[in-house]
């Protein structure tokens, strides 16, 4: 699985996930306006007052 990656100290691009990480995720930290993209081992989706996150089994949801 190849996911887009982005973080506060990581440049935009793509990363190949390890075999144990089967989800591409994106997370938006609403207070500071920081986006993070990458691979994840478990599925986590939430939308709270300070964090929005979404994961899927392709890289379509973390672009």
Curated annotation (Swiss-Prot):
Its main location: secreted. One of its GO terms (molecular function) is toxin activity. GO terms for cellular component: extracellular region. It is found in: Secreted. Expressed by the venom gland. The keyword rRNA-binding does not apply. Coiled coil: none annotated. Disulfide bonds join 3-24, 17-39, 25-55, 56-61. Belongs to the three-finger toxin family. Ancestral subfamily. Orphan group XIX sub-subfamily. SUPFAM superfamilies: Snake toxin-like (SSF57302). It comes from Dendroaspis angusticeps. This is Toxin Tx7335. Keywords: Disulfide bond, Secreted, Toxin. Transmembrane segments: none annotated. InterPro entries: Snake_toxin-like_sf. Contains 4 disulfide bonds.
């Amino acid at each position: 699985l190849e996911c887009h990656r982005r973080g506060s100290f990581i440049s935009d691009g793509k990363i190949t996930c390890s075999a144990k990480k089967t989800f591409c995720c994106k997370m938006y930290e609403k207070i500071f306006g920081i986006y993070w993209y990458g691979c994840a081992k478990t599925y986590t989706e939430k939308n709270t007052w300070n964090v929005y996150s979404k994961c899927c089994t392709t890289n379509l949801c973390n672009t």
